């Protein structure tokens, strides 16, 4: 049901935006209905057509505490959508001839080690970003969640060998966050820039995303940023 609702929302927004003129009033009403349907405090919507922003608006509130309204400039965390930035960044290095998708991870991170010696030696950059490590959904997530603990990417690399597989390598799609943390470390070692520095200087800034930051900790002005919320049982 959740997927159907999301699909319907996307289709409706697309249908409202295919014309040269955006029907802002209908779109506003749709977003308001969406807020009620999903029971969320706020949402930001942006539509780009032919390289131009034709709709940008915040709806609802950014915090249940202060009740301040969302607007088109409110900073919102993108969570796992950041994985797309990681893949894009790695692809830039591949295009530049500095990296290959089928490079062994140990070529760039010699201390990398998984649950099995053979798997460790065969594991590639492609494996890191295609969720086929063989480890279970959510395996090792407590190494970096909740945000604010003192674990680093080096700690993840050191401890990922203790995570047990639930399937053989490349046999199944099993979503795993830690492999992307390690992919970020590959990016750092090949480019000489931290993941955050690369994302901001090579991707965000060149396309005008100067108001965006690669992580919450890099946001210096927090006067217009959302609070994280969760439903109380």
Question: What is each model feature region?
Answer:
Residues 15-19:
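N-terminal signal peptide c-region/cleavage motif recognized by signal peptidases
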Residues 59, 117-233:
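Short, surface-exposed loop or secondary-structure junction motifs
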Residues 5-14:
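Sec-dependent N-terminal signal peptides
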Residues 1-3:
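N-terminal secretory signal peptides that target proteins for export/translocation
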Residues 101-116, 206-207:
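Short, glycine/proline-biased beta-turn/loop segments that scaffold the active-site neighborhood
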Residues 28-31, 45, 51, 59, ...:
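Active-site SXXK
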Residues 22-76, 100, 158-164:
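Short, conserved catalytic-motif segment at the N-terminal edge
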């Amino acid at each position: 049901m959740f997927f159907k609702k999301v699909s319907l929302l996307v289709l409706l927004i697309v249908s409202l935006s295919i014309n040269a003129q955006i029907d802002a009033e209908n779109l506003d009403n749709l977003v308001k209905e969406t807020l009620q349907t999903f029971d969320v405090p706020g949402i930001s919507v942006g539509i780009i057509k032919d390289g131009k922003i034709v709709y940008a608006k915040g709806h609802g509130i950014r915090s249940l505490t202060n009740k301040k309204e969302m607007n088109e400039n409110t900073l919102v965390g993108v969570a796992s959508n950041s994985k797309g930035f990681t893949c894009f960044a790695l692809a830039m290095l591949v295009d530049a001839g500095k990296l290959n998708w089928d490079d062994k991870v140990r070529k760039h991170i010699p201390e990398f080690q998984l649950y099995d010696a053979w798997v460790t030696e065969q594991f590639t950059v492609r494996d890191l970003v295609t969720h086929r490590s063989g480890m279970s959904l959510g395996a090792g997530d407590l190494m970096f969640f909740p945000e604010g603990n003192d674990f680093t990417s080096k700690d993840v690399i050191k401890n990922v060998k203790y995570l047990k597989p639930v399937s053989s390598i490349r046999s199944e799609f099993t979503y795993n966050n830690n492999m992307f943390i390690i992919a970020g470390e590959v990016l750092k070692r090949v480019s000489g820039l931290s993941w955050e520095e690369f994302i901001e200087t090579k991707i965000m800034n060149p396309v005008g995303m100067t108001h965006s930051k690669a992580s919450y900790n890099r946001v210096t002005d927090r006067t217009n940023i959302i609070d994280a919320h969760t439903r109380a049982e």
